Amino acid sequence: EVYSDKVGQAAATKLCRSVMIKGVEALLTESMLAARRYGVEQVVLDSLSDLLPLPDWNATARYMISRSLEHGSRRAEEMREAARTVAEAGVAPLMSDAIAKRQDWAAGHRDALSPDLAAMLDAITETQDSR
């Protein structure tokens, strides 16, 4: 698909989209880990349907978190590149930098991958607690 005839717009589109996608993954990871600690993860997931109606927030959260665990190292580097692109646009890359940190962090928890969200969150928490 051709986005534009202008040089660099396709790359800028891809990187700006990555900020959004990887950012949602980072937010879900952090939110679900905290929610699991408090025992409210299902309540939080159910409440998200009011904002963004998806057929299965549990499956979406599991999928997005697992992608970060599986590909965190590569995604962190992509987010550092995105941060540079955001900065070149004159925007402080506060979120892009934070997303890169969360993706780096996620890469260290790859062993927690599971087809079950609760099991995956518990495995991450156990690994985190033992460090």
Regions found by a protein language model. Name each.
Residues 1-7:
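A short, charged helix-loop
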Residues 8-12:
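Disorder-to-helix initiation segments
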Residues 13-116:
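Helical "substrate-binding/catalytic lid" subdomain
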